[in-house]
């Protein structure tokens, strides 16, 4: 009987030992890369306070990592997913014994998804520019009115032009342009068109013959200074055709199908004096109409025949960004030629503003200027870059 009682007591004691709760796992060793942050002053001075604010350990910890309440934010809709976990740089989650109010600084390794969104690469379209040869070029800054010495009150039209081939110049008053680039004089009975043949040459000067000038006193101010954009009638138009006169294709030349440059101008009154202002210049090449645009700074990039010291040290020839390479890229639509192609390719990924006027950039036009022979008819080979 004693043996049975003894064995029963041992069995009960053995069963009690089997149901004893296992002790909690020891805390992980601290990270060697970053020291734990210091405790607050009041906790260091009073350890009892630290024990009071320490949360009771959870016997069933959640296997999913819980972000500190002061750190986690709900990501906005459409945010990029988090990058893969980096086992070399990340630190283990804080032990439940640690206070969440002072999470380790290394927890910043878990980035907020909104800051990881990469900037989209701008869409860039490359197009080849068209090279056009302009055989006749009227220098629009030279277009002016001169008083007729033999006929007081009348004014003669004069200008300077360059021509690489022979051709014909026509001056039309109150001209209207048709679809095939043909100019029609709307007041031909009062001011008939003036036509003059020319030979090839540079720096040629045109001037109306005496007695054929315009008398502004016979016209109303509304007719002279009316906006040409409203009526599509320009008070003055000059058409320079690059076509030999008297050839077998004379009828084709009169139809306007030959290469030509058209300069359209209006009259303006400045301090009682009537002056000419050029509105636009048009190129008609192989049946296609092109409108010429000024490029600011292209004159500084053309290497002329003058090799003087002042020209060699001209600071306007270099790129405004690197200050070393020559300018060969124009910003559109402001038309500032101010950069080299290398800086332009880098700049378009950083900003969409012109370095000169800070206007938005729509296209970058690279122009390779072959040289300047003094004619002003330089041709260019370039590439346009469209950025959206």
From Swiss-Prot:
Residues 159-281 are annotated as: DAR2 domain. Residues 22-40 have a biased composition (Pro residues). It is found in: Cell membrane. One of its GO terms (molecular function) is ubiquitin protein ligase activity. Residues 1-43, 368-388 are annotated as: Disordered. Expressed in the vascular tissues in both phloem and xylem parenchyma cells. Disulfide bonds: none annotated. Disruption phenotype: No visible phenotype. Myristoylated (in vitro). A lipid is attached at residue 2 (N-myristoyl glycine). The keyword Electron transport does not apply. One of its GO terms (biological process) is intracellular amino acid homeostasis. Changing residue 321 to A: Reduces E3 ligase activity. It comes from the Eukaryota. Keywords: Cell membrane, Lipoprotein, Membrane, Metal-binding, Myristate, Transferase, Ubl conjugation pathway, Zinc, Zinc-finger. A zinc finger (RING-type) spans 319-358. Belongs to the RING-type zinc finger family. LOG2 subfamily. Acts as an E3 ubiquitin-protein ligase, or as part of E3 complex, which accepts ubiquitin from specific E2 ubiquitin-conjugating enzymes and then transfers it to substrates (in vitro). Required for GLUTAMINE DUMPER 1(GDU1)-induced amino acid secretion and for amino acid homeostasis. Ubiquitinates GDU1 (in vitro). Interacts with GDU1. The RING-type zinc finger domain mediates binding to an E2 ubiquitin-conjugating enzyme. This is Probable E3 ubiquitin-protein ligase LOG2. It comes from Arabidopsis thaliana. The gene is LOG2.
